[in-house]
Swiss-Prot record:
Keywords: Isoprene biosynthesis, Manganese, Metal-binding, NADP, Oxidoreductase. One of its GO terms (molecular function) is NADPH binding. This is 1-deoxy-D-xylulose 5-phosphate reductoisomerase. Pathway: Isoprenoid biosynthesis; isopentenyl diphosphate biosynthesis via DXP pathway; isopentenyl diphosphate from 1-deoxy-D-xylulose 5-phosphate: step 1/6. It comes from Protochlamydia amoebophila (strain UWE25). Pfam families: DXP_redisom_C, DXP_reductoisom, DXPR_C. Belongs to the DXR family. Its EC number is 1.1.1.267. It catalyses: 2-C-methyl-D-erythritol 4-phosphate + NADP(+) = 1-deoxy-D-xylulose 5-phosphate + NADPH + H(+). InterPro entries: DXP_reductoisomerase, DXP_reductoisomerase_C, DXP_reductoisomerase_N, DXPR_C, DXPR_C_sf, NAD(P)-bd_dom_sf. It comes from the Bacteria. The lineage of its organism: Bacteria, Pseudomonadati, Chlamydiota, Chlamydiia, Parachlamydiales. 1-deoxy-D-xylulose 5-phosphate binds at K121, S147, E148, S172, H195, S208, N213, K214, E217.
Amino acid sequence: MKHIAILGSTGSIGKNTLQVARHLKERIKVVAIAARENIDLLEAQSKEFCPDIIAVFNNAKAYELQKRLPGKTVLAGMEGLLAAASYSEADLVISAMTGTMGLQPTIEAIKAGKDVGLANKEALVSGGAIIMKLVKEKNINLLPIDSEHSAIFQCLNGEALKSVQRIILTSSGGPFRTWTQEQLETVTVEQALNHPTWSMGPKVTIDSSTLMNKGLEVIEAFWLFDVSPEQIDVIVHPQSIIHSLVEFCDGSMLAQMSEPNMIVPIQYSLTYPDRAPGLFKPFDFMKNSKLEFFEPNKKTFRCLALAYEALKCGGTLPCYMNAANEVLVERFLKGELSWKNIGIQLEKLMDQHASISVDSLETILAVDALAREEAARSKLISTK
C-alpha cells in the first residue's frame, strides 16, 4: 500500500489523482490533502478519503472548514501546506498546486526524503537549480506528471543520457493554431479557455493558448533530463496522441502514445516503478489514424520564444518570466488586457529585468514578488 499526500487536491490534477486513488484503492491510500481555498470540495474529499492531514492555504477558509469538520485538525497557511508536504506517513507527494505557491511545499517534501510526483512546472522553472540539487542529495524519485515529461521519462527508462540527441516536446498548438493576426486581435476569454484536446485549469489553459505552457515545459525538460536548450525541440501535433519523443544518436526514436487524458501519466507516477490496469479501453488505431505535425510559429506565439530566451539567459530570468506571466494571465482573465498583450507585455517586462544567479529560496521569492508587482502595474501598449 502506497501512502500519498496531494497538494492541490481540488484542482484538475488533484481531482484526477483522487480518481486514480479510487480506482486503485487496494494499492493507494490518501493520507494528506491540501488546497488553496476551495473548502466545499475539500470537505467532500476529506469525508470520502479520511486523510490524516487537511490543509488550507487561506487562513479564513481553514477556520471555516475546521468548524465544519470538528473531529478533524485543519491546518492553515503556508505552514499547513509544508506540514502536508512533509507528513511522515506519506511515501509520495503529488505537487499539483498551480503557480509559485507550490515551490516551497515541493522543496519541503524533497527535504523530508519524499518521492515527488511533480505537476507544478513553475517550481522547476523558478527553482530548478535548488530543486535538482536537493533531489540528488536526498536521492529521491522526482516523477514528472505533465504528459510530455512523463512520456520522455518513460522513453529514457534504461537509456544512457549520452545517447540522447534530441528531446521533442509535442504541443496541440492550442485553440488559435490556425488563426490570423487579425483574428488574434479579438480573442475572448471564453475562446482562450476552450482548449481543443485537454481539460485543464484556467491558468494552464490560457498558457496553452499562448504556448507559454510549452515554453515552461521546455525549461522543465532542461532541468529534469539534464540536456542543453539546443537539444529540446517543440513540434505541433494537434491530435495530442504522441505525448513526446526522444531521438537517439543512432537515428532511432522512441515515442509514448495514449489518449489525451491526464489519468494516464498520473497513474504512472502513483504506481512507479510498476504499472497497474488502467481506466481506459485499448487504443483504437483506426479511430486515431491521422497524426499530423507542424512547426510552431514563434513569431505569432512569442511566449514560446521568450521561454527559450529565458532558459538560455538563465539566472533569475525564468523565475521572473514565470511570475510576470501569471499576473498577466490573471489580468487577461479579468478583462484588463487583450490576449495578444500577454506576450507583448511579458517581453517588455523581461527586457527590463537584470538577471542575477539563483543562490537561495529567498532570492527566488524576492524576484517572484518583484515580477508580480511590476506586471500588475505595467501600462498596456498597442498590439497593432
